UniProtKB/Swiss-Prot annotation:
InterPro entries: Ribosomal_uS4, Ribosomal_uS4_bac-type, Ribosomal_uS4_CS, Ribosomal_uS4_N, S4_RNA-bd, S4_RNA-bd_sf
Domain S4 RNA-binding: 91-154
Example of a GO biological process term: translation
Organism whose genome encodes this protein: Acholeplasma laidlawii (strain PG-8A)
Record's protein name: Small ribosomal subunit protein uS4
Matching SMART domains: Ribosomal_S4, S4
Description of how the protein assembles with itself and partners: Part of the 30S ribosomal subunit. Contacts protein S5. The interaction surface between S4 and S5 is involved in control of translational fidelity.
Gene Ontology CC: small ribosomal subunit
Job of this protein: One of the primary rRNA binding proteins, it binds directly to 16S rRNA where it nucleates assembly of the body of the 30S subunit. With S5 and S12 plays an important role in translational accuracy.
Length: 198
């Protein structure tokens, strides 16, 4: 399955969850799009599990193939698989670029990485799924700081999560892996584990 490129607002309304993590999509119309959007049918257990999986997949903007591959990697780690799975997604380069406030959305962050605007430990990395290890640095190329999407994001001064840091020179650090209570608060990752293990 290819990466989704349609309206994220419609997806958020269909899932009943803000995939932009701002809540804006659901303020005006907190129901599914379409003629019968306000009539939400009762979901089966499978439907509930699928919906939870889709919420997370769309939040991070990854294809089904990448999503499942990451899930299988998390099975090889010690600890709770669902929690490890989310931590692997959270340590993706495109996500950390977004968390550092270099862009307003993960889609923009993915674009920056793809186009070679991002340096990791001083070297260009253009793979959005590149997984950062704690202590690695992330920064924009000097000329990339003048991009409109970057300027607008930096001016907005989004609050950073505690597991990334940005210094006065614009160099970000992926300080540590996040604790589970620091991100995606409303997601039940166990439902995703059950979906793939059914």
């Amino acid at each position: 399955m290819s990466r989704f490129t349609g309206s994220t607002w419609k997806v958020s309304r269909r899932l009943g969850y803000s995939i932009s993590e701002t809540g804006k999509e659901l303020k005006k119309r907190p129901y599914a799009p379409g003629q019968h959007g306000q009539r939400r049918s009762k979901l089966s257990n499978y439907g509930i599990q699928l919906q939870e999986k889709q919420k997370v997949r769309f939040v991070y903007g990854v294809s089904e193939k990448q999503f499942k591959k990451t899930f299988l990697e998390s099975a090889k780690m010690q600890g709770k698989q669902g929690e490890n799975f989310l931590k692997l997604l959270e340590s993706r380069l495109d996500n950390v670029v977004y968390r550092l406030g270099f862009t307003k959305t993960r889609a923009q962050a993915r674009q920056l990485v793809n186009h070679g605007h991002i340096l990791v430990d001083g070297k260009k990395v253009d793979i959005p799924s590149y997984r950062l290890a704690p202590g690695q640095t992330v920064q924009l190329k000097e000329k990339s700081k003048n991009l409109t999407i970057v300027k607008e994001a930096l001016e907005a001064q989004f609050a950073h999560v505690d597991y990334v840091a940005l210094d006065a020179n614009g160099v970000g650090t992926f300080s540590r892996l996040p604790e589970r209570n620091e991100f995606l608060f409303d997601i039940n990752e166990q439902l995703i584990v059950e979906f793939y293990n059914r």
